[in-house]
């Protein structure tokens, strides 16, 4: 499924990684929205704006900004030494106000293809039950970024942007993170890296397999970008937590690079564990499970992935070679041993569904990766079951179509959206278990769910307010077809099953 790329942002929630004595108390926030909804708070507060502080906050003075800017080159050198990525030119810097950040976020939301695709997927995510029906994704994301952004690197203008309301003692670690993005950009051109994906996103779901191919690649790539930056952030904290960046005189002193997460491997786990414990009253903390997991994934699991590459192959593997041979699935990020062994799960492509075009039009399509499956399982079963079953994932994709001429009175209605979801598993037993869990989710997703009569082996049929739901398990494959008439559902299932049989036969030759 499409993940939201936060444009090389550093989030306030990541500051929980900093030693407690080095962070200033942030202003108290207004009461949180209900878990998994976030809607009540959005209705009560101004929408599309960063949340104003509830107590007076310190603004960086011109003198403090000048002093911070003098550290940029020094911290850039530290990041270069830490990663092995060369400095090809200096990095421009700016101190921006809350109003300027609001403008930047607003402008990004006008035409950012990641955001446009994410919002196009909103109704499908609601059909999967991963977002509440009344949830307003656009307003939530604008408010979330207004609340959470603590610094960002603009890859188009090549500028690191510091925020004038962020505490002084957070600014240097944020710089270390964002300057890593600048180094990535200088060596690998971040803007060019995403151009092809943007072109595919703009074309929309007319070619569903094109979207399926790039979804997981984009997720993995973002995890690499943020994981590398988080490692530099961690190494900076390790080297300065005892005052290692303090010295006499006006000029910034050299930052020691004697400590690394390689030497303190448990430090990464400590940081991640601390973040798991730091549940507060922010929008992110109380967001739907899908958003919490997917927005934090690149930072947390990306950091863990890069730390494992550092241990196995040093800086060259963790910061250069991985950019030349990117992981292509969230599975490789979640299980670094899969990447290191060169084991890749290919995209699960869908057959030609052109027979739908008389009555339906393309609505959305994408991959359903191991991360997505893990979230889906956590939503509908115990976390321990999700942790055990999700590694058995071996591929997944979905295709959604809209019924032509449908004009639902409720904009959150999904009855006019037909959904085909295919998932592949390591064994028949894993597929069977997933099919049962997926079926058990239907009462939480649809109204008026009744168990119908199925006449095909391995199939369950359900009647819902959104129309019939067919769940077919054939071996290690699970096919869910939702909101289609029975005859159309049968054609869809047969098309998927025939294609998968042909793929298996071709692979066996």
Regions found by a protein language model. Name each.
Residues 15, 171-175, 421:
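Hydrophobic/aromatic side chains embedded in well-ordered alpha-helices
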Residues 28-87, 98-113, 164-165, 179-419, ...:
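Soluble, non-membrane globular domain cores that form compact, hydrophobic packing
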Residues 89-91, 147-149, 156-158, 170-172, ...:
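Envelope-exposed proteins and targeting segments
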Residues 146, 158-176, 216-221:
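Short pre-active-site segment immediately N-terminal to the catalytic Zn-binding motif
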């Amino acid at each position: 499924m499409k993940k939201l790329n936060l444009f090389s942002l550093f989030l306030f929630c990541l500051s929980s990684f900093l030693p407690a004595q080095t962070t200033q108390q942030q202003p108290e926030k207004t009461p949180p929205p209900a878990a998994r909804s976030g809607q009540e708070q959005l209705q009560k507060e101004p929408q599309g704006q960063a949340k104003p502080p509830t107590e007076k906050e310190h603004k960086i003075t011109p003198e403090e900004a000048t002093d911070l800017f003098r550290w940029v080159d020094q911290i850039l050198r530290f990041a270069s030494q830490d990663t092995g990525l060369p400095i090809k030119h200096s990095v421009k810097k700016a101190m921006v106000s809350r109003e300027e950040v609001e403008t930047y976020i607003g402008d990004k939301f006008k035409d950012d293809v990641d955001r446009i695709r994410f919002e196009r997927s909103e109704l499908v995510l609601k059909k999967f039950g991963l977002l509440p029906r009344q949830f307003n994704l656009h307003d939530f994301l604008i408010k979330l970024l207004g609340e959470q952004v603590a610094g960002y690197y603009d890859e188009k203008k090549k500028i690191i942007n510091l925020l004038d309301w962020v505490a002084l003692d957070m600014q240097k670690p944020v710089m270390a993170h964002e300057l890593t993005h600048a180094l990535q950009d200088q060596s690998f051109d971040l803007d060019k890296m995403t151009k092809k994906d943007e072109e595919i996103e703009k074309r929309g779901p007319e070619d569903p397999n094109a979207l399926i191919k790039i979804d997981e690649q984009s997720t993995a790539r973002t995890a690499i970008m943020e994981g590398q930056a988080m490692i530099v952030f961690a190494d900076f904290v390790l080297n300065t937590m005892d005052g290692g960046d303090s010295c006499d005189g006006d000029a910034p002193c050299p930052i020691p690079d004697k400590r690394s997460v390689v030497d303190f491997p448990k430090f990464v786990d400590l940081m991640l564990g601390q973040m798991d414990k730091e549940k507060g009253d922010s929008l992110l903390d109380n967001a739907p499970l899908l958003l919490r997991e997917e927005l934090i994934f690149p930072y947390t699991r990306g950091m863990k992935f890069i730390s494992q590459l550092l241990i196995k192959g040093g800086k060259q593997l963790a910061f250069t070679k991985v950019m030349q041979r990117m992981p292509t699935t969230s599975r490789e990020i979640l299980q670094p041993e899969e990447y290191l062994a060169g084991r890749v799960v290919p995209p699960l492509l869908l057959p030609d569904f052109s027979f739908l075009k008389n009555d339906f039009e393309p609505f959305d399509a994408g991959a359903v990766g191991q991360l997505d499956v893990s979230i889906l399982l956590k939503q509908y079963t115990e976390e321990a079951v999700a942790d055990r079953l999700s590694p058995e994932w071996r591929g997944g994709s979905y295709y959604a179509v809209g019924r032509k001429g449908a004009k639902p009175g409720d904009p959150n209605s999904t009855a006019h959206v037909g959904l085909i979801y295919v998932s592949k598993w390591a064994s028949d037993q894993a597929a069977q278990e997933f099919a049962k869990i997926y079926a058990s989710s239907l009462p939480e997703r649809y109204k008026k769910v009744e168990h119908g009569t199925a006449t095909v082996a391995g199939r369950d049929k359900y009647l819902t307010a959104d129309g019939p739901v067919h769940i077919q398990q054939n071996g290690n494959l699970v096919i869910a077809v939702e909101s289609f008439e029975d005859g159309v559902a049968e054609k869809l299932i047969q098309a998927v099953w025939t294609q998968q049989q042909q793929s298996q036969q071709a692979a066996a030759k």
